[in-house]
Structures are given as C-alpha cells and as structure tokens.
C-alpha cells in the first residue's frame, strides 16, 4: 500500500468519526461559510453560530487545534481560528460522502 493511499484512508476514517459526533461535526462545519469557503472565527462566534455551550465548543476547538484540523492566529489579545489544510481535506470528505448519498 503506498503512502498516499494510506493517508487517504486515514482522512476518510477521521471524517467518518467526526461525522458521527454531532458536536464535532457542527464545530468543524462552522468554519465553512454559505459559499463553501473557509472562514475565520473566534470561539465565541462558533458557539453562537451553532448554539452550543461555550465550554463544549471551546474544548472542541482546542482539540481540533491540537489535532491540526484548524489553525490559530493571534489578533491582538484575541485568537482567531480557521480550517487548516487537513481540516479542509476532512470537509472535502464530507462533501464527497454527501454526493455519494445523493447518487444512491
């Protein structure tokens, strides 16, 4: 098995696990705007968008940051988050799965 194939399988598995957790899925997808593009948000904005408790959203954002699914940028004393390249690949897996489901 070549390295790219192994990497693709791991991304698909990660996407499936996130997709099975409603909170994790909502937090990750909050970073995608209505045009399907990645957007920058702070943790409070994510919590308000998806209407989940701040502690839950903050913990999920922190875990995604530690896992490398989102990137953090300091703006003054605040931190802004956006999808990393890995996070974008996971979202692409969600989109691909949705298209497959529509074609069934």
From Swiss-Prot:
Q: Which UniProt keywords apply?
A: DNA-binding, Plasmid, Plasmid partition, Repressor, Transcription, Transcription regulation
Q: Which residues bind DNA?
A: 43-50, 54-65
Alphabetized GO MF terms: DNA binding; identical protein binding
Null phenotype?
A: Loss of plasmid replication. TubZ levels increase, TubZ still polymerizes.
| Biotechnological exploitation | A miniplasmid containing this and downstream gene tubZ is able to replicate in B.thuringiensis subsp. israelensis and express insect toxin proteins. The miniplasmid could be used to make plasmids for insect toxin overexpression.
Another remark in the UniProt entry says: The pBtoxis plasmid encodes all the major endotoxin proteins (Cyt1Aa, Cry4Aa, Cry4Ba, and Cry11Aa) responsible for the mosquito larvicidal activity of strain 4Q2.
Q: Could you tell me what this protein does? A: A DNA-binding protein that is part of the type III plasmid partition system used to ensure correct segregation of the pBtoxis plasmid. Cooperatively binds to the centromere-like site (tubC), which may seed filament formation by the TubZ polymerizing GTPase, stabilizing TubZ filaments. TubR-tubC complexes track the depolymerizing minus end of the filament, probably pulling plasmid within the cell. Required for plasmid replication. Negatively regulates levels of TubZ; its effect on RNA expression has not been shown.
Binding partners and assembly: Homodimer. Binds to tubC DNA, the TubR-DNA complex binds to TubZ.
Would you tell me the protein name for this molecule? DNA-binding transcriptional repressor TubR
Name the species this protein comes from.
Bacillus thuringiensis subsp. israelensis
Gene of this entry: tubR
């Amino acid at each position: 098995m070549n390295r790219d194939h192994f990497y693709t399988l791991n991304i698909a598995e990660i996407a499936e696990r996130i997709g099975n957790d409603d909170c994790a899925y909502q937090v990750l997808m909050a970073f995608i705007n209505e045009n399907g593009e990645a957007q920058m948000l702070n943790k409070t904005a994510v919590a308000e968008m998806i209407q989940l408790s701040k502690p839950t959203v903050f913990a999920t954002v922190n875990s995604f940051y530690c896992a490398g699914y989102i990137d953090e940028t300091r703006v003054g004393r605040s931190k802004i988050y956006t999808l990393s390249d890995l996070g974008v690949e996971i979202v692409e897996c969600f989109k691909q799965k949705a298209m497959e489901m529509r074609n069934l």
